[in-house]
Amino acid sequence: MAVNGILGIKLGMTQVFAEDGTAVPCTVLQAGPCVVVQRRTRDKDGYDAVQLGLVEFIKPQRINKALTGHFKKAGVAPMRYLGEVRLQDAKDETKPGDRVLVDGFQVGEYVDVSGVSKGKGFQGGVKRWHYGGGEASHGSMFHRAPGGIGASSFPSRVWLGQHFPGHMGNERKTSKTLRVVKIDSDENLLLVRGAVPGPSGAYIYISRAKKQKKAPQVAPAKAKPAKK
């Protein structure tokens, strides 16, 4: 099955130790198991993909009739979280009911993780856009205010794209090129280096990184000349 990604849940952060003893910050992700709910084909839908459902079952009375019929047609139990993943091979014979597991990833490869970031509410320019702020000295009455937002008689308006205070967070973000540090196939766990958007317990989408990093090339050590 040439599925390019998998659905999961962010469990939290931990650290593992490399061979040289350095601590590596990692995010623990529950990657699957997922079940194929629908198969999209190029002839019918214009592209090749599968709709996955994260195996986190929900009571039938908690979903509407449209989703009830959707799951019934696929022959799978109702699930809480659905997501669509493109197929690498158009000739892939994936069908509804097939399972997608974390075994599709390998230690050392890089992945992109997408999720909804933590909501911060209404925030000012200093926190939201990293404004420097005014002077903190005695007599200053300008500390965390936005400051000037435009020019004089020209253009007599505020330029588009100015950074202002406003709602911060609660947006779909993607952490790119995170290295897979460890895989636990028995518990469907995936450990990636670095941080991932969203709080613990948030739904995420894991896909192979579009930009795979190359392994660092270590130059061979030069042989020292023999002492005479």
Predicted region positions:
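Extended basic (Lys/Arg/His-rich) segments that typically form rRNA-contacting surfaces
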Residues: 1-228
